[in-house]
Regions:
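Conserved SAM-binding loop
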Residues: 93, 118, 141, 213, ...
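Mobile active-site "lid"/loop adjacent to the S-adenosyl-L-methionine
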Residues: 189-220
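Residue-level signal for inorganic ion chemistry
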Residues: 29, 67, 97, 126, ...
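A short N-terminal interaction module
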Residues: 1-57
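Conserved AdoMet
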Residues: 32-107
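Conserved Class I SAM-dependent methyltransferase catalytic core
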Residues: 215-278
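Conserved SAM/SAH cofactor-binding pocket of Class I
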Residues: 96-197
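Helix-to-beta-strand junctions that scaffold the AdoMet/dcAdoMet cofactor pocket
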Residues: 161, 206, 232-234
Length: 280
């Protein structure tokens, strides 16, 4: 069987199982099995493959049809300008979160030797993207998950910035190391009661601990704000990702802790997404 027929068979199976990006996913899964680029597959569709390759491909297609995200199946996710290693231990990087990178780069355009803290570092996509762009910035990432930190370290090595970043296993309440010019965080912000309404791919496979924002959706955001007020230098900046309906509540929490809200930015779907504030 040649590549074209394999892709068609995989696509048809995925379509029957309501996978919207069926053809693209088939190409990506075949790329993973063959260890070649998607472009290579598209340009060589008449190439025949062995039964062993076809069998491996089918197994991945079945997993994808069950809802398992493509990023977990191929072990990588594109974010900002880079490809990040991911497993089921970390949340898959979202395009909406790139807004944080964009705004941080605007904020720090003329800054140097900034110390950055990422609370809940996960795969490292936020912190490491910033450090990759800003060659004289130094970063610290904390997470309660040992596996997440291992993945962040792998991504730091891949990007060649391990010498400018440190990682610590800690929850935010117990972290006391240093003072920072900039703190970033994409904390869990979905109400516990709303988790069941998430897409099948998300609720079935992604880590609940990275999604669950507690009864009111802001329990983790509250912790980040409280601790940031202690860990941040005067006039330091806090950049948070929030849910579309949390603007008012988060502003209240920030004001109580002595932060001035500079601006709230909308994402590409015109939802409130990123809040920037200054510690007074």
């Amino acid at each position: 069987m040649n590549l074209q027929n394999i892709i068609r068979e995989g696509s048809n199976y995925l379509k029957k199982n309501n996978i919207k990006s069926a053809e693209l996913d088939s190409e990506l899964l075949l790329s993973e099995v063959l260890k070649v680029s998607r472009k290579n597959i598209i340009l060589n569709q008449d190439q025949d493959v062995s039964n062993e390759i076809f069998s491996k491909f089918k197994n991945l297609v079945i997993l994808r049809a069950s809802g398992k995200p493509i990023a977990y199946l191929i072990g990588t996710k594109a974010f900002w300008k880079y490809n990040f290693f991911v497993t089921e231990e970390v949340l898959i990087p979202r395009p909406d979160s790139e807004l944080i990178i964009e705004k941080v780069l605007d904020l720090t355009k003329n800054k140097s030797k900034i110390k950055v803290l990422d609370i809940g570092v996960g795969s490292g996509c936020l912190l490491l993207s910033i450090l990759k762009e800003k060659k004289d910035f130094y970063g610290t990432g904390i997470d309660i998950s040992k596996k997440s930190l291992e993945i962040s370290k792998i991504n730091a090595l891949k990007l060649g910035i391990s010498n400018r970043v440190k990682f610590f296993k800690s929850d935010i309440d117990n972290f006391v190391s240093g003072k920072y010019d900039l703190i970033i965080s994409n904390p869990p912000y979905i109400k516990s009661i709303d988790l069941k309404y998430l897409e099948r791919d998300v609720i079935k496979f992604e880590p609940k601990i990275a999604l669950n924002g507690g009864i009111d959706g802001v329990s983790e955001i509250r912790k980040v704000i409280d601790k940031s007020s202690e860990l941040m230098k005067v006039n330091g900046k806090l950049v948070l990702e929030i849910a579309f309906n949390q603007k008012t509540k988060v502003k209240e929490l920030l004001n109580k802790k002595g932060f001035y809200v500079n601006k709230i930015f909308k994402d590409y779907a015109n939802n409130n997404r990123c809040i920037i504030c200054t510690r007074l």
